[in-house]
């Protein structure tokens, strides 16, 4: 719900959580943590919104591998981190407590003070002439770990770049269209876990180049 409010602020998009791609971290297991450690990464729950080349917005809330060089890597416990990027201001990082008695009390006190002066909350992006819309036309680069390959729809992947097989648990890394995981349960059941890769949004133009590269590596 917090992410829905931020979408309204940043892009003027009105939506509900049931229309979004989201999941928590309860399915993350020991193998996933070991893979992250071997790559000098950590797994964080990250909400993202990015304007695509066609003007629509890709948005989701999922566990993600975060590189050690990324500022979000060091965000832990009750702290939150926000990264904002614009055409003129480049990247900006905000860091602070998102839970606890004092941060909550401070926010409530701020709202009470605002009411005294007749302040009304505004969503200025909702009044823009051409509101942004959520996109369903992009691919995601994901890591999937599982116990039984039969539960994974391999045919849905546009490409699979890594495959590791183990005695009890295996994983793969590949690129899959949003429609293959949005409102689908295969990646949430049968002890399956999904984690986004750091560079995870693949637009159609980039996907075409990815397929060309795959064919080239295959000698076709």
List the predicted regions and their residue ranges:
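Catalytic, metal-anchored helix/loop core of enzyme active sites in primary metabolism
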Residues: 58-145
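Context-gated lysine
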Residues: 2, 34, 44, 50-51, ...
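A conserved regulatory-domain signal marking ACT and ACT-like small-molecule sensing domains
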Residues: 112-220
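A broadly conserved detector of short glycine/acidic/proline-rich loop/turn motifs that flank catalytic sites
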Residues: 47-49, 65, 88, 98, ...
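Short secondary-structure transition/capping segments
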Residues: 33-43, 91-99, 103, 161-168
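A short, terminal or domain-edge coil/loop segment
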Residues: 44-48, 99-112, 170-181
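Generic marker of "main functional regions" within proteins
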Residues: 13-17, 30, 46, 53, ...
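Substrate-binding/catalytic subdomain of NAD(P)-dependent oxidoreductase enzymes
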Residues: 1-74, 79-81
